[in-house]
Structure formats: structure tokens, C-alpha cells
């Protein structure tokens, strides 16, 4: 739209329109210049890197991805930028940029330069690496002006006039920078605190009402929210289930560009017992899977590839939602081969994902094990940092009370264990037992067996868990 506007202005030379940008602006520069020939010159910075680096799980800002770029078999960054040929392009790098390492950028440039040469425009692409951190600093802008002078044949001094930075105080949008002093304003932290207080009040009410009314409340607050109807806003879930049924080699596509490889540990014997094992640590998953396989279990390990937390949030989802879908897809594949399917979630993210999957596929699992490092949702409110680390979007706590989530699981057997809190302090066993006392009572009200509660630490669970899953205890 902006480019259309510029081209409509009589005072703009349409033969000399350049596009330059940094970071997310660098991404837009890449895409706009590659796809629209009206851009005569491109100068992207702080976004050039190999596709494998852009699409790993390092937390890069991938909300501006080019469609298909995250597909390992799709077009790479070098192929995308080669579309700018034969127009001039200057690739600017920052030596101190940890998000887009110069090494990856230079490898990308070498491929682009080769492609430019094959297309007869070898002299039209340049690479400069300036000694600065992530950003479009004066050193980089000086290179930009030089490149513009060279190709647009303009005589412009590349030295910028000195600019006096504004004082921090003058940039505040409220007196003293205290936004919360504005009448009626709130922050994400205070909104989550309010949500926590509301949930705590609701729990007190649950203690006072009759078992029948409590069961009805649980049904409406947990099970209904976990129903497919609650997820109609995301049709990709239904598409993913359909796709998973088509894959014969245990390769599940969650959605275009996101591949999940399912590794199988143990012998796939028809009629055996399968365990879908999800952990917050991939290396720990393999260690546990190997140990559980010694109990005669077939362990399925879903491994995520090409992911980004920020992309998930900006797409209206959270990392937890996709992990839940991985468990569900993997369980459906396992059910086609084995007689019984169990699910294990080890760690906070994994345990929540497994519980959600068990609520939505209640007929599929014979046993569900939850080995979590949080005893209840209250501990999430201890710090703002923990909120961000858990990738919770604002309002998440209003829609899902994790303390009540196990109530929606209808599996005949449920195993719950606590390890330690998120801040690595020793687990408060009294608080944990009190928390699960309500859980056990309410499950019995719903005519579901009480869960096994195991307040042990770390690796001590493996022996007991393996015996329980294999049916020995």
C-alpha cells in the first residue's frame, strides 16, 4: 500500500525507489524487494540468515516469516533474495548481532552472490559487516548512503549531522513514566493477578458447595473447555488430525512447514502397550524412553522441529497448544499398532499438554501419568518472569485453571507426581497433598478412580513409573 502511494506521487522518481530496513524491517525489505520489481534497490540488515537458523527454536522474531520459508524443503533465504536480481542489493551485517550471526549471514551471502553471478549480475550484490550490535547504527547507515550514491548516481554526503538524543524523561507517556498512575489503567501483570484472585475465590466456593454441584462446576469449567467445540477458532487442529492419519512412516505434519518426527524406542509388537512420552527436555526424553523400554513398553517420542514461541503467540496459540496436538497425533498413530496407549507428561509444559490431550481423547488412553514440576497454578503468580517463561498470553489464566485440569481426565488410571517448584525450592509436600485432596474427592464424585500420588524427586520416578505403566503394580 505504501509503495502504491509512493508510485502515485508526481514528485517521486519511480525508477529510483529503494527499500531498506532492519530486523523485522529487514524481513519486509527481503519480501517486498523480491516480490515487487518496483523496488529498484534493496538494503536489508539484521535479518539475513540461513533458513535452518531462522526456523529453529532459538526464539528468533519469526512473526514476519515468508510463507513456506520455514519448510526445510522449501525456498531458502538465499533463493528468496536471489529473486531481487538483477537489481542492486547491499547485505548489511552486524558483527555483534547474536540473533543473526555474521557467520550464517556470510554463508548466505556467498550463495546469493553465486546465484547473482549465474544470472549475469555478479557486480550488483555487496556484503558489508560493521562492528555493531543488532540495529541500524550510523556505521551501517553510512554504507547505505554509499550504496545509494553508487547506484542512483546522487552526490549525497554519507556523514550524518549530529543528532542530540531525547532525554528519557521526555519520552514518557505519563508523569514520571508511571503508566499505572493513569486512572483506570492496568498492566498485564496486574490483570493476571486479578485473574489469580478470581480463581482462588472460585476454589473456596468449590470447597463449600455440595459434591454434586462441584462436579457440575468442574464439567462446565474444564471438560467443556477441552471439547473440540472450544477449538473451532483453529481449523488447523482438525486438518492436523486428518494429516496424521495419512502418514505411514510416523511423520506427522502439524501444519504447513512444521514437521514432527516421532521416534520409536522398543519393539513395535502388535497388541503391546505403547507409551507416548513428552518431556520439556528432549535429551531427558530419550534417557527415560530407553529405561521405560526395558519394561517391555513401546515408547513414542514426538520431537518438534522448526518452531518458534513468538510465532505461536502471534498466531493466537501458545506453545502448549501445539505440544498437546503433538501428543494427540502421536497417540492416534500408536493406537493403530498397539493394544493399549498410555501417555506421560514430564515437566510443566509437557504435563499440561498431556492432560489436555487426555481430556480431549478420553477414550484413547488406558493410563495417564503426570510428572510435573509445579504443584498448582498458584505458584505461577510468584513472578512476572515466570509468566513470560511459560509463554502465557494475557488472559490465559482466565480460561484454564490448571489445578482443575486433571478432573477432566476419564482414564481408568491416573498417576500424579511432584518433583520441585519452578524456582528450584524444595517441594511443599503439605501444600501438594492438600491440593490433590480436593482433586481426589472430586474425581470420586465423578465416579472416577482417585489418582496415585507420588511425592518423590526426579529420577526416582522412573522405576515406579515403568512398573506402573507396564501393569506390574
Predicted regions and their residues:
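Catalytic-domain carbohydrate-binding cleft regions of carbohydrate-active enzymes
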Residues: 20-22, 29-33, 40, 44-52, ...
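Alpha/beta-hydrolase
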Residues: 45, 278-279, 304, 371
Amino acid at each position: 500500500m505504501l509503495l502504491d502511494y509512493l508510485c502515485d506521487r508526481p514528485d517521486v522518481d519511480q525508477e529510483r525507489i529503494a527499500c531498506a530496513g532492519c530486523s523485522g524491517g529487514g524481513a519486509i525489505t527481503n519480501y517486498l524487494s523480491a516480490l515487487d520489481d518496483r523496488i529498484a534497490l534493496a538494503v536489508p540488515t539484521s535479518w539475513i540468515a540461513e533458513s535452518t537458523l531462522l526456523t529453529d527454536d532459538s526464539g528468533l522474531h519469526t512473526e514476519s516469516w515468508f510463507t513456506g520459508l520455514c519448510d526445510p524443503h522449501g525456498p531458502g533465504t538465499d533463493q528468496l533474495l536471489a529473486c531481487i536480481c538483477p537489481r542492486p542489493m547491499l547485505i548489511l551485517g552486524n558483527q555483534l548481532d547474536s540473533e543473526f550471526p555474521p557467520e550464517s549471514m556470510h554463508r548466505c551471502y556467498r550463495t546469493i552472490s553465486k546465484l547473482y553471478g549465474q544470472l549475469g549480475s555478479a557486480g550488483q550484490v555487496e556484503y558489508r559487516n560493521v562492528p555493531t550490535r543488532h540495529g541500524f547504527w550510523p556505521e551501517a547507515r553510512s554504507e547505505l548512503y554509499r550504496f545509494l550514491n553508487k547506484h542512483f548516481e546522487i552526490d549525497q554526503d554519507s556523514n550524518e549531522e549530529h543528532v542530540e538524543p531525547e532525554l528519557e524523561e521526555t519520552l514518557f507517556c505519563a508523569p514520571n513514566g508511571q503508566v499505572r498512575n493513569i486512572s483506570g489503567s492496568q498492566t498485564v501483570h496486574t490483570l493476571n493477578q486479578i485473574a489469580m484472585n478470581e480463581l482462588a475465590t472460585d476454589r473456596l466456593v468449590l470447597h463449600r458447595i455440595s459434591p454434586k454441584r462441584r462436579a457440575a462446576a468442574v464439567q462446565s469449567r474444564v471438560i467443556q473447555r477441552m471439547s473440540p467445540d472450544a477449538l473451532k477458532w483453529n481449523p488447523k487442529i482438525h486438518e492436523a488430525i486428518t494429516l496424521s492419519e495419512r502418514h505411514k512412516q510416523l511423520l506427522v505434519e502439524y501444519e504447513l512447514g512444521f514437521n514432527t518426527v516421532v521416534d520409536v524406542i522398543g519393539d513395535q509388537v502388535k497388541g503391546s502397550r505403547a507409551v507416548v512420552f513428552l518431556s520439556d527436555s528432549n535429551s531427558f526424553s530419550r534417557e527415560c524412553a530407553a529405561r521405560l523400554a526395558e519394561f517391555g513398553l513401546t515408547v513414542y517420542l514426538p520431537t518438534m522441529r522448526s518452531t518458534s514461541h513468538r510465532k505461536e503467540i502471534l498466531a493466537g496459540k501458545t506453545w502448549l497448544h501445539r505440544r498437546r496436538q503433538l501428543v494427540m497425533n502421536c497417540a492416534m498413530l500408536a493406537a493403530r499398532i498397539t493394544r493399549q496407549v498410555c501417555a506421560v507428561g514430564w515437566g510443566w509444559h509437557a504435563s499440561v499438554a498431556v492432560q489436555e490431550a487426555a481430556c480431549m481423547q478420553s477414550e484413547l488412553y488406558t493410563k495417564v501419568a503426570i510428572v510435573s514440576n509445579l504443584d498448582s497454578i498458584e505458584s505461577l503468580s510468584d513472578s512476572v518472569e515466570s509468566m513470560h517463561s511459560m509463554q502465557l498470553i494475557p488472559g490465559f489464566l482466565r480460561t484454564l485453571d490448571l489445578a482443575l485440569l486433571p478432573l477432566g481426565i476419564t482414564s481408568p488410571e491416573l498417576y500424579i507426581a511432584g518433583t520441585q517448584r519452578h524456582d528450584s525450592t524444595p517441594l511443599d509436600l503439605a501444600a501438594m497433598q492438600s491440593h490433590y485432596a480436593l482433586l481426589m474427592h472430586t474425581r470420586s464424585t465423578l465416579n472416577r478412580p482417585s489418582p496415585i500420588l507420588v511425592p518423590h524427586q526426579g529420577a526416582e520416578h522412573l522405576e515406579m513409573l515403568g512398573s506402573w505403566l507396564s501393569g506390574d503394580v
